[in-house]
UniProtKB/Swiss-Prot annotation:
<feature type="binding site">
    <location>
        <begin position="11"/>
        <end position="39"/>
    </location>
    <ligand>
        <name>NADP(+)</name>
    </ligand>
</feature>
<dbReference type="GO" id="GO:0019640">
    <property type="term" value="P:D-glucuronate catabolic process to D-xylulose 5-phosphate"/>
</dbReference>
<keyword id="KW-0119">Carbohydrate metabolism</keyword>
<dbReference type="GO" id="GO:0005997">
    <property type="term" value="P:xylulose metabolic process"/>
</dbReference>
<keyword id="KW-0313">Glucose metabolism</keyword>
<dbReference type="GO" id="GO:0005903">
    <property type="term" value="C:brush border"/>
</dbReference>
<dbReference type="GO" id="GO:0042732">
    <property type="term" value="P:D-xylose metabolic process"/>
</dbReference>
<dbReference type="Pfam" id="PF13561">
    <property type="entry name" value="adh_short_C2"/>
</dbReference>
<dbReference type="GO" id="GO:0005829">
    <property type="term" value="C:cytosol"/>
</dbReference>
<keyword id="KW-0968">Cytoplasmic vesicle</keyword>
<dbReference type="GO" id="GO:0005881">
    <property type="term" value="C:cytoplasmic microtubule"/>
</dbReference>
<dbReference type="GO" id="GO:0001669">
    <property type="term" value="C:acrosomal vesicle"/>
</dbReference>
<feature type="modified residue" description="N-acetylmethionine">
    <location>
        <position position="1"/>
    </location>
</feature>
<dbReference type="GO" id="GO:0006006">
    <property type="term" value="P:glucose metabolic process"/>
</dbReference>
<protein>
    <recommendedName>
        <fullName>L-xylulose reductase</fullName>
        <ecNumber>1.1.1.10</ecNumber>
    </recommendedName>
</protein>
<comment type="function">
    <text>Catalyzes the NADPH-dependent reduction of several pentoses, tetroses, trioses, alpha-dicarbonyl compounds and L-xylulose. Participates in the uronate cycle of glucose metabolism. May play a role in the water absorption and cellular osmoregulation in the proximal renal tubules by producing xylitol, an osmolyte, thereby preventing osmolytic stress from occurring in the renal tubules.</text>
</comment>
<keyword id="KW-0521">NADP</keyword>
């Protein structure tokens, strides 16, 4: 199926590992020119080795001024994937200011900032575009020790709807994907304990965690012209977790 991504210019944050890295590879394979953003230069270097032709930007999205400087001259962007995130897990009574600030700065504030930069460019060019925010099932369900993380993702879902409302008249679509646990290398490590995994799997009707390609496929669909009447949606990639 042709997704119409060839020749489009895409920017992906959190591109060094996991979902972001796989999204970069899939977009380039579909013919897009990709700008990969990560705070870790070594990850970007290995990405370029694996995927020559990818443009890279190394910046910590928690730093507003550095992000503005790094992305202000990134050039025209047609497609944006806001994937960068942190998950600092603490019991509610032990939540620290540092964890709160870092989580909201990366998971929400950076989405606003990067999307503003990209959307302003689209509007100035009179060009349509698509933005996908990588959210989580944690936006809609309370999970132990996830007070701050769940809050950032709940806010991201509403931000997605607000962006869709205000950017729609400019022909810019905005959607979110909401995965369950994803079997990235980190996911496999964090959920390697069979007892811990069983507690979550018992709440998933399909009885399995998501693979990275499940999430990437959803992202590419929402970026593509195949979803050109879809905006403001939050698409679960969760095996049915949110229906339980």
């Amino acid at each position: 199926m042709d997704l119409g991504l060839a020749g489009r210019r895409a920017l992906v944050t959190g591109a060094g590992k996991g979902i972001g890295r796989s999204t970069v590879l899939a977009l380039q394979a579909a013919g897009a020119h990709v700008v990969a953003v990560s705070r870790t230069q070594a990850d970007l270097d290995s990405l370029v080795s694996e995927c020559p032709g990818v443009e890279t930007v190394c910046v910590d999205l928690a730093d507003w001024e550095a992000t503005e400087q790094a992305l202000s001259s990134v050039g025209p962007v047609d497609l944006l994937v806001n994937n960068a995130a942190v998950a600092l897990l603490q019991p509610f009574l032990e939540v620290t200011k540092e964890a709160f600030d870092m989580s909201f700065n990366v998971n929400l504030r950076a989405v606003i900032q990067v999307s503003q930069i990209v959307a302003r460019g689209m509007i100035a060019r009179g060009a349509p575009g698509a933005i996908v925010n990588v959210s989580s099932q944690a936006s809609q369900r309370a999970l132990a020790n996830h007070s701050v993380y769940c809050s950032t993702k709940g806010a991201l879902d509403m931000l997605t709807k607000m962006m869709a409302l205000e950017l729609g008249p400019h022909k810019i679509r905005v959607n979110a994907v909401n995965p369950t646990v994803v079997m990235t290398s980190m996911g496999r490590t964090n959920w390697s304990d069979p007892h811990k995994a069983k507690v979550m799997l018992d709440r998933i009707p399909l009885g399995k965690f998501a693979e990275v390609e499940n999430v990437v496929d959803a992202i590419l669909f929402l970026l593509s012209h195949r979803s050109n009447m879809t905006t403001g949606s939050t698409l679960p990639v969760d095996g049915g977790f949110l229906v339980t």
